[in-house]
C-alpha cells in the first residue's frame, strides 16, 4: 500500500511519524517557536517532499490512500501559534485552491484509491469545502467541529 499525506505539517495525528507506507508532503519545511498561553512551544515541519498540494509531484494513479488535512484558518495572526502550527489559507482564493488540490489528489490516487479528509469548521463550514471539491464524501463524522471524511475516486469510464 502506498500512502500520501499531502499536508503533513508536524505529523500530529500519526502514531508512527515514520510510517513506512507513507510519503509525507508539505509546502512548508521549518521549525517554529511561539508563545502559547504563556508557554514557549516548538513545532517542526519536516516532510519527505516539499511541494504544494495544488501541484503534487507524483505520477497519475500512484497512491492507494491520500490523507488531506489542509490548513483551515483564514483568520489568524501571522505570528500566532495556531498559524505556525496549522498554516493558513487565503480568504479570497481558498475555494479555487481547494478545487485544484482535490483534482490533483484524485489524479494521484489509483482507480480504487481512497481520500481521507480532515477539516475543522471553526471558520469555514464543511459544506462550502465540499462545494469547492465538487463532490460529496461517501461517509464522515458530522457531529463535531473537526470532521473526518472518506472519499473514493470516481470511475471515469
Task: Annotate each predicted stretch with a short phrase.
Residues 1-157:
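Class I S-adenosyl-L-methionine-dependent methyltransferase catalytic core
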Amino acid at each position: 500500500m502506498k500512502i500520501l499525506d499531502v499536508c503533513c505539517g508536524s505529523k500530529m495525528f500519526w502514531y508512527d511519524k515514520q510510517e513506512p507506507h507513507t510519503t509525507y508532503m508539505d509546502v512548508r519545511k521549518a521549525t517554529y517557536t511561539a508563545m502559547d498561553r504563556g508557554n514557549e512551544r516548538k513545532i517542526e515541519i519536516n516532510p519527505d517532499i516539499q511541494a504544494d498540494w495544488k501541484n503534487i509531484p507524483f505520477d497519475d494513479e500512484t497512491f492507494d490512500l491520500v490523507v488531506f488535512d489542509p490548513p483551515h484558518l483564514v483568520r489568524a495572526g501571522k505570528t500566532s501559534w495556531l498559524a505556525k502550527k496549522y498554516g493558513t489559507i487565503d480568504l479570497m482564493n481558498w475555494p479555487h485552491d481547494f478545487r485544484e488540490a482535490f483534482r490533483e489528489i484524485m489524479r494521484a490516487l489509483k482507480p480504487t484509491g481512497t481520500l481521507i479528509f480532515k477539516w475543522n469548521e471553526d471558520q469555514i463550514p464543511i459544506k462550502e469545502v465540499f462545494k469547492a471539491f465538487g463532490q460529496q464524501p461517501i461517509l464522515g463524522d458530522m457531529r463535531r467541529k473537526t470532521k473526518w471524511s472518506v472519499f473514493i475516486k470516481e470511475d471515469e469510464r
